[in-house]
């Protein structure tokens, strides 16, 4: 095992030395991809390669993305910890289940922790890119994703960042891009929708409230998009166990799109639950 690590480290040094002779961004990218495959985003030699890449091609957007990945990955450590009474943690199934002294099941989950200084360096990279390229969605998405991972059960900063993004869209009507390509309003809505789903998947009170709040903002911004109306219905159904309110929003979504699968499926679930409840009373 030690010999394998030594071999990989020597290979990393060789790759970085070769990088000094690279003449195109594509060649740097190839060297970087090979290094990451072997050693990971924060492996030996990655930072040196990025320094040389940035020096040779300071405007290559691949460099800050790679540098963010370097700091973000380096800031992480994980532990498998017991979470008594929890079936899921941050939307994830248990890594393993063991018995306690009374014979009961105790679920263990992998949980990530972050070095604040290194995480801060990752955020500096993204903030600089957002300031320089405010209409490039990738930088915003990376920041929201990282903040949500850092905050875990209560994604306060991630939600605030998402609110700012929606406000910017409403006030400035920017010509969004995603990875340098033109991104229309549908792509923007899809991206926000994915973060709503992420907040919902956290499964905490804070996650549900941000799921509702962002969905309501997007419903005001895009009233003809049934996805966010469905979201509000799901908030009432799952977080508040209020079927009457949920039905109201699902039916509203179906008026906009009669083929809305989410609304149709959830209304059937509610109907089945109500029928079962009536049957029990008989």
Residue ranges and their predicted role:
Residues 63, 139, 174-175, 191, ...:
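TPR alpha-solenoid repeat register
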Residues 69, 145-147, 197, 234-235, ...:
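Residue-level recognition of tetratricopeptide repeat
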Residues 178-238:
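Alpha-helical adaptor scaffolds
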């Amino acid at each position: 095992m030690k010999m394998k690590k030594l071999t990989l480290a020597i290979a990393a040094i060789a790759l970085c030395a070769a990088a000094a002779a690279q003449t195109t961004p594509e060649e740097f990218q190839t060297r970087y991809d090979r290094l990451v495959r072997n050693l990971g985003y924060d492996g030996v030699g990655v930072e040196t390669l990025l320094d040389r890449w940035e020096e040779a091609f300071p405007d290559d957007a691949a460099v800050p993305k790679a540098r963010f990945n370097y700091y973000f990955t380096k800031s992480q450590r994980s532990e498998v910890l017991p979470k008594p009474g929890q079936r899921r943690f941050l939307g994830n199934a248990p890594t393993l289940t063991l018995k306690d002294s009374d014979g009961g099941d105790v679920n263990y989950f992998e949980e990530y922790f972050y070095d604040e200084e290194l995480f801060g360096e990752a955020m500096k990279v993204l903030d600089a890119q957002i300031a320089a390229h405010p209409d490039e969605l990738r930088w915003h998405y990376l920041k929201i994703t990282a903040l949500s991972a850092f905050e875990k059960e209560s994604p306060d900063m991630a939600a605030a960042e998402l609110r700012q993004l929606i406000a910017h869209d409403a006030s400035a009507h920017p010509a969004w891009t995603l990875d340098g390509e033109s991104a229309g309003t549908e792509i923007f809505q899809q991206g926000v929708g994915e973060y709503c789903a992420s907040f919902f998947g956290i499964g905490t009170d804070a996650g549900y409230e941000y799921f509702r709040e962002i969905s309501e903002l997007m419903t005001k911004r895009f009233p003809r998009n049934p996805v966010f109306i469905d979201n509000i219905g799901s908030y009432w159904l799952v977080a508040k166990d209020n079927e009457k309110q949920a039905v109201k929003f699902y039916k509203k979504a179906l008026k906009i799109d009669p083929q809305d699968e989410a609304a149709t499926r959830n209304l059937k679930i509610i109907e089945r639950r109500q029928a079962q409840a009536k049957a029990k009373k008989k």
